[in-house]
């Protein structure tokens, strides 16, 4: 299901596909590109941002994507095998189709990298921590957004300790 709304919330495009019909990454990007061409009002796409689940120890902030960064991110597939390949597929596809289009990755693990190193450690031998075994934390983009908005939504909660739950296909607590 594809749905696009304007700044006022009015639906400007919607498409349903039959049950079980799968576009795949290439089909989805093709549909989105076609929609943007017909609804851009003369504007052009100047960049693409991606949510990427795992930045490992290498990426604790958004990163401009190039072949070297994508190669780095591929090494984290074993740490997030259900997500990372699907995060990287549209990046690679767009790199092949539009190599001059800037792309940026924002990492779900980055928010938790701001914790003290001790909080990232498991109660395991230090050699394992030094080899990269740690609490990476997930759903960080969601938590980062909530942390940035909490003061304006609930100043009293923002002034103290707050527990936030991320519940969906995956679940976490921060």
For the regions a language model picked out, list residue spans one by one.
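Short beta-strand-loop/turn "lid" adjacent to the catalytic site in phosphate-handling enzymes
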Residues: 36-83, 102-104, 111-119
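Short, hinge-like loop/turn segments at secondary-structure boundaries
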Residues: 8, 66, 121-124
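Electropositive phosphate-/nucleotide-binding environments in soluble metabolic enzymes
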Residues: 22-26, 30, 42, 63, ...
């Amino acid at each position: 299901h594809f749905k696009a709304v304007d700044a006022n919330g009015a639906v400007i495009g919607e498409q349903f596909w039959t049950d079980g019909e799968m576009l795949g990454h290439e089909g989805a990007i093709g549909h989105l590109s076609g929609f943007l061409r017909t609804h851009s009002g003369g504007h052009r796409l100047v960049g693409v941002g991606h949510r990427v689940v795992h930045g490992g120890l290498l990426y604790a902030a958004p990163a401009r994507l190039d072949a070297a960064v994508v190669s780095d991110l591929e090494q984290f597939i074993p740490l997030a095998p259900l997500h990372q390949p699907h995060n990287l597929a549209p990046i690679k596809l767009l790199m092949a189709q539009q190599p001059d289009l800037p792309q940026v990755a924002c990492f779900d693990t980055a928010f938790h990298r701001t914790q003290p190193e001790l909080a990232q450690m498991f109660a395991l031998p230090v050699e394992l921590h030094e080899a990269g075994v740690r609490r990476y934390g997930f759903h960080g983009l969601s938590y980062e957004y909530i942390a940035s908005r909490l003061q304006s939504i609930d100043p009293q909660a923002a002034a103290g300790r707050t527990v936030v739950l991320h519940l969906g296909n995956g679940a976490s607590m921060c």
